[in-house]
Amino acid sequence: MSGASRVFSCRIYGVLREDGKVLLTRSAFRGSSFINFPGGGVEIGEGPMSALLREFVEETGLAVRPVRALYSSERAHLSTQAPIQIVSAYWLVERVGGKLRAGGNDDDVLDLLWADPARLPVEEMFPADREFAGYLPNFLD
Protein backbone atom coordinates (compact mmCIF):
# COMPACT_ATOMS: atom_id res chain seq x y z
CA MET A 1 0.00 0.00 0.00
CA SER A 2 1.38 3.40 -0.90
CA GLY A 3 1.76 6.24 1.57
CA ALA A 4 -0.76 8.41 -0.28
CA SER A 5 -3.78 9.37 1.78
CA ARG A 6 -7.16 8.10 0.69
CA VAL A 7 -10.29 10.16 1.05
CA PHE A 8 -13.74 8.64 0.58
CA SER A 9 -17.19 10.10 0.29
CA CYS A 10 -19.77 7.64 1.62
CA ARG A 11 -23.08 8.13 -0.17
CA ILE A 12 -26.43 6.47 0.38
CA TYR A 13 -29.48 6.55 -1.87
CA GLY A 14 -33.07 5.38 -1.63
CA VAL A 15 -35.07 3.72 -4.38
CA LEU A 16 -38.77 4.47 -3.92
CA ARG A 17 -40.94 2.45 -6.27
CA GLU A 18 -44.61 3.28 -6.74
CA ASP A 19 -46.93 2.26 -9.57
CA GLY A 20 -44.02 0.52 -11.34
CA LYS A 21 -41.84 3.66 -11.47
CA VAL A 22 -38.94 4.90 -9.35
CA LEU A 23 -38.47 8.38 -7.97
CA LEU A 24 -35.49 10.38 -9.25
CA THR A 25 -34.12 13.84 -8.56
CA ARG A 26 -32.84 16.42 -11.02
CA SER A 27 -30.19 18.45 -9.25
CA ALA A 28 -28.12 21.51 -10.07
CA PHE A 29 -24.37 21.09 -10.48
CA ARG A 30 -21.81 23.60 -11.73
CA GLY A 31 -24.21 25.39 -14.05
CA SER A 32 -25.73 22.18 -15.36
CA SER A 33 -28.03 19.47 -14.05
CA PHE A 34 -27.89 15.74 -13.46
CA ILE A 35 -30.29 12.99 -12.43
CA ASN A 36 -29.89 10.54 -9.59
CA PHE A 37 -31.78 8.81 -6.81
CA PRO A 38 -32.78 10.72 -3.67
CA GLY A 39 -29.95 10.60 -1.18
CA GLY A 40 -26.47 11.91 -0.69
CA GLY A 41 -23.48 12.07 1.57
CA VAL A 42 -23.15 10.61 5.04
CA GLU A 43 -21.99 13.40 7.35
CA ILE A 44 -19.32 13.01 10.04
CA GLY A 45 -20.89 11.47 13.14
CA GLU A 46 -23.97 10.28 11.22
CA GLY A 47 -24.88 6.68 10.45
CA PRO A 48 -25.83 5.59 6.92
CA MET A 49 -29.52 4.98 7.73
CA SER A 50 -29.84 8.36 9.45
CA ALA A 51 -28.27 9.97 6.39
CA LEU A 52 -30.68 8.18 4.07
CA LEU A 53 -33.73 9.31 6.04
CA ARG A 54 -32.44 12.89 6.34
CA GLU A 55 -31.50 13.21 2.68
CA PHE A 56 -34.81 11.76 1.49
CA VAL A 57 -36.82 14.30 3.49
CA GLU A 58 -34.53 17.18 2.46
CA GLU A 59 -34.72 16.35 -1.23
CA THR A 60 -38.28 15.07 -1.65
CA GLY A 61 -40.35 16.02 1.41
CA LEU A 62 -41.10 12.33 2.00
CA ALA A 63 -40.42 10.24 5.09
CA VAL A 64 -39.33 6.73 4.14
CA ARG A 65 -38.46 3.44 5.79
CA PRO A 66 -35.51 1.35 4.58
CA VAL A 67 -36.74 -2.05 3.34
CA ARG A 68 -33.59 -3.81 2.14
CA ALA A 69 -30.16 -3.19 0.72
CA LEU A 70 -30.03 -3.38 -3.07
CA TYR A 71 -26.48 -2.60 -4.13
CA SER A 72 -23.13 -1.11 -3.19
CA SER A 73 -20.39 0.18 -5.44
CA GLU A 74 -18.37 -2.44 -7.28
CA ARG A 75 -15.95 -0.08 -8.99
CA ALA A 76 -13.86 2.88 -7.95
CA HIS A 77 -15.54 6.13 -8.94
CA LEU A 78 -13.77 9.43 -8.49
CA SER A 79 -15.78 12.36 -7.26
CA THR A 80 -15.92 15.54 -9.28
CA GLN A 81 -13.76 16.78 -6.41
CA ALA A 82 -10.87 14.39 -7.13
CA PRO A 83 -9.00 12.70 -5.53
CA ILE A 84 -12.06 11.84 -3.43
CA GLN A 85 -13.41 8.36 -4.20
CA ILE A 86 -17.15 7.70 -3.94
CA VAL A 87 -18.51 4.64 -2.16
CA SER A 88 -22.27 4.36 -2.78
CA ALA A 89 -25.01 2.19 -1.28
CA TYR A 90 -28.56 1.92 -2.61
CA TRP A 91 -31.56 0.83 -0.53
CA LEU A 92 -35.11 0.00 -1.43
CA VAL A 93 -37.37 2.26 0.64
CA GLU A 94 -41.09 2.67 1.18
CA ARG A 95 -43.02 5.85 1.85
CA VAL A 96 -44.29 6.28 5.41
CA GLY A 97 -45.28 9.95 5.42
CA GLY A 98 -44.66 13.45 4.22
CA LYS A 99 -45.74 15.25 1.08
CA LEU A 100 -43.89 15.04 -2.23
CA ARG A 101 -42.34 18.39 -3.23
CA ALA A 102 -42.74 18.07 -6.98
CA GLY A 103 -40.89 21.30 -7.76
CA GLY A 104 -37.70 20.48 -5.91
CA ASN A 105 -36.46 21.76 -2.56
CA ASP A 106 -35.42 25.36 -3.32
CA ASP A 107 -31.81 24.32 -2.74
CA ASP A 108 -29.94 21.78 -4.86
CA VAL A 109 -32.88 19.71 -6.16
CA LEU A 110 -34.55 21.34 -9.17
CA ASP A 111 -37.25 18.76 -9.81
CA LEU A 112 -38.51 15.27 -9.00
CA LEU A 113 -39.51 12.79 -11.66
CA TRP A 114 -40.80 9.24 -11.94
CA ALA A 115 -39.18 6.84 -14.39
CA ASP A 116 -39.50 3.26 -15.57
CA PRO A 117 -36.62 1.32 -13.93
CA ALA A 118 -35.78 -0.29 -17.28
CA ARG A 119 -35.60 3.10 -19.05
CA LEU A 120 -33.71 5.39 -16.73
CA PRO A 121 -32.11 8.52 -18.21
CA VAL A 122 -28.60 7.14 -17.62
CA GLU A 123 -27.02 9.64 -20.02
CA GLU A 124 -27.81 12.32 -17.40
CA MET A 125 -26.36 10.36 -14.46
CA PHE A 126 -22.91 10.30 -12.93
CA PRO A 127 -20.92 7.06 -13.44
CA ALA A 128 -21.62 5.58 -9.98
CA ASP A 129 -25.38 5.94 -10.44
CA ARG A 130 -25.15 4.72 -14.02
CA GLU A 131 -23.43 1.54 -12.76
CA PHE A 132 -26.31 0.85 -10.35
CA ALA A 133 -29.01 1.78 -12.87
CA GLY A 134 -27.92 -1.06 -15.14
CA TYR A 135 -28.70 -3.59 -12.41
CA LEU A 136 -31.84 -1.99 -10.99
CA PRO A 137 -34.51 -3.85 -13.01
CA ASN A 138 -33.10 -7.18 -11.75
CA PHE A 139 -33.31 -6.05 -8.12
CA LEU A 140 -36.97 -5.06 -8.38
CA ASP A 141 -38.34 -8.32 -9.81
Residue ranges and their predicted role:
Residues L92, A102-Y135:
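NUDIX/MutT-family hydrolases
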Residues S9, R17, F37, V64, ...:
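Short connector loops at helix/strand junctions that flank enzyme active sites
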Residues R17-V22, R30-G31, E43-I44, S72-H77, ...:
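Short, charged/polar surface micro-motifs in flexible loops or helix N-caps
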Residues A63-S72:
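A short coil-to-beta-strand element that immediately follows conserved catalytic motifs
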Residues E18-E58, L62:
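Conserved Nudix-box catalytic region and its N-terminal flanking loop in Nudix hydrolases
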Residues M1-L23, L92:
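Conserved N-terminal beta-strand and adjoining loop/helix that marks the start
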Residues S2-R6, A82, G104:
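Short Gly/Pro-enriched turn/cap motifs at secondary-structure boundaries
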Residues R75-R101, L113, L136:
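Active-site-adjacent beta-strand/loop module that shapes the phosphate/pyrophosphate-binding cleft
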